[in-house]
């Protein structure tokens, strides 16, 4: 029989070993939960059901701070998987992205974008939402919801854990409470911002040759809207009288502004915008295949004149400053007003100038 002191030493040693093993197991368990691993990692014979979400991001999605994961880490309180159909052009997809982000946060869900939206927005902005793998998208039991273009009470209490949104939402009523986060998501990549600022630095006032202090971005939407607005929506696009009045509004309030004009109809702009004061610069390239060049230029201006469309909305929203927009651009009985609410489309502090609807009256005459 061992002396009593030896027995105590052995018991103490065994107790330390047991406590160390328990502590090690608890540490591994807690660390695995913190990093998103479940009991299936510790016990391979257990097959737990996990949400069908992507585990990778496409190249170009920035990494979150203080993490080695290529995808941003979602807060542990979020669950489920939400995404949105990428539809339409550049401005449409910006609206879809911002609305998805805002509604997912409001409902405590994780937001993912589809590869097509990533391909449109990631080359321009430092977006952070992860990308849903196509194979995961195809096997997820989605519920689908088409959104109208303004925030509604029912959108704050959507119970579906796997929801695919659709539509063309671009209303500030969805996301304005997250304005700084939205502006951060739509931060330009450095080379695009620097290129746009380089263009602005080279501009000079025509009469004096001085460097302007105030830049007003002007976006003139034309293209397919020339047919779509009058023929489908009983509406008009901006004419030269609107642009002249909008520019005069800024001239009356800002010292020596310069107007930086971009459009998908630059030829019309050069022929119809009054340049006699020497403060109008035609800087846009009008290339619809590469809209980010004009967009970057507009966002680096101090203020905005927009006409109609989501491209102009987002340029104004990100630029900040004063915004003048084309108001009342459809007839009162237009079907467009069933899907578009002006009070939900334009921020309350923005200034509207009424459109000239007389061309529509001419069309209506027998």
UniProtKB/Swiss-Prot annotation:
Keywords: Glycoprotein, Glycosyltransferase, Golgi apparatus, Lipid metabolism, Membrane, Signal-anchor, Transferase, Transmembrane, Transmembrane helix. Disulfide bonds: none annotated. Its EC number is 2.4.1.69, 2.4.1.344. Residues 1-8 are cytoplasmic. Glycans are attached at residues 66, 302, 328. GO terms for molecular function: alpha-(1,2)-fucosyltransferase activity; galactoside 2-alpha-L-fucosyltransferase activity. The chain crosses the membrane at residues 9-25. One of its GO terms (biological process) is fucosylation. Residues 26-366 are lumenal. It is found in: Golgi apparatus, Golgi stack membrane. Pathway: Protein modification; protein glycosylation. One of its GO terms (cellular component) is Golgi cisterna membrane. It is a single-pass type II membrane protein. It catalyses: a beta-D-galactosyl-(1->4)-N-acetyl-beta-D-glucosaminyl derivative + GDP-beta-L-fucose = an alpha-L-Fuc-(1->2)-beta-D-Gal-(1->4)-beta-D-GlcNAc derivative + GDP + H(+); a ganglioside GA1 + GDP-beta-L-fucose = a ganglioside Fuc-GA1 + GDP + H(+); a beta-D-Gal-(1->3)-beta-D-GlcNAc-(1->3)-beta-D-Gal-(1->4)-beta-D-Glc-(1<->1')-Cer(d18:1(4E)) + GDP-beta-L-fucose = alpha-L-fucosyl-(1->2)- beta-D-galactosyl-(1->3)-N-acetyl-beta-D-glucosaminyl-(1->3)-beta-D-galactosyl-(1->4)-beta-D-glucosyl-(1<->1')-N-acylsphing-4-enine + GDP + H(+); a neolactoside nLc4Cer(d18:1(4E)) + GDP-beta-L-fucose = a neolactoside IV(2)-alpha-Fuc-nLc4Cer(d18:1(4E)) + GDP + H(+). It holds the Pfam family Glyco_transf_11. Its main location: Golgi. Catalyzes the transfer of L-fucose, from a guanosine diphosphate-beta-L-fucose, to the terminal galactose residue of glycoconjugates through an alpha(1,2) linkage leading to H antigen synthesis that is an intermediate substrate in the synthesis of ABO blood group antigens. H antigen is essential for maturation of the glomerular layer of the main olfactory bulb, in cell migration and early cell-cell contacts during tumor associated angiogenesis. Preferentially fucosylates soluble lactose and to a lesser extent fucosylates glycolipids gangliosides GA1 and GM1a. Belongs to the glycosyltransferase 11 family. This is Galactoside alpha-(1,2)-fucosyltransferase 1. It comes from Sapajus apella.
């Amino acid at each position: 029989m061992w002396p009593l002191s030896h027995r105590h030493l052995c018991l103490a040693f065994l107790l330390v070993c047991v406590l160390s093993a328990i502590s090690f197991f608890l540490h591994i368990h807690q660390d695995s939960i913190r990093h998103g691993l479940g009991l299936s990692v510790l016990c391979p014979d257990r097959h737990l059901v996990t949400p069908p979400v992507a585990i990778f991001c496409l190249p170009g999605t920035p990494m979150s701070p203080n993490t080695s994961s290529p995808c941003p880490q979602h807060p542990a309180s979020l669950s489920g998987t939400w995404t949105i159909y990428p539809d339409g052009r550049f401005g449409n997809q910006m609206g879809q992205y911002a609305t998805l982000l805002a509604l997912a946060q409001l409902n405590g869900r994780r937001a993912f974008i589809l590869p097509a939206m990533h391909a449109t927005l990631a080359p321009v902005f430092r977006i952070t939402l992860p990308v849903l793998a196509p194979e995961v998208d195809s096997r997820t039991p989605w519920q689908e919801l088409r959104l109208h273009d303004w925030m509604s009470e029912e959108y704050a209490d959507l119970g579906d854990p796997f929801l695919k949104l659709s539509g063309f939402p671009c209303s500030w009523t969805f996301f304005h409470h997250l304005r700084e986060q939205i502006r951060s998501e739509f931060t330009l990549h450095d080379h695009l911002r620097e290129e746009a600022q380089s263009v602005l630095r080279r501009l000079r006032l025509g009469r004096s040759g001085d460097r302007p202090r105030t830049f007003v971005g002007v976006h003139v939407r034309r293209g397919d809207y020339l047919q779509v607005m009058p023929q489908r929506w009983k509406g008009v696009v901006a004419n030269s009288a609107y642009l002249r009045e909008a520019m005069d509004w800024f001239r009356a309030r800002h010292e020596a502004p310069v107007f930086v004009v971009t459009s998908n109809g630059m030829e019309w702009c050069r022929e119809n915008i009054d340049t006699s004061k020497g403060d109008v610069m035609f800087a846009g390239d009008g290339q619809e295949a590469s809209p980010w060049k004009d967009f970057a230029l507009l966002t680096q201006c101090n203020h905005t004149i927009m006409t109609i469309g989501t491209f102009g909305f987002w340029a104004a929203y990100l630029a900040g400053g004063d915004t003048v927009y084309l108001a009342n651009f459809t007839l009162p009985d237009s079907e467009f007003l069933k899907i578009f609410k002006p009070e939900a489309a334009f921020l309350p502090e923005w200034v509207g100038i009424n459109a000239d609807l007389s061309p529509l009256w001419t069309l209506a005459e027998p």
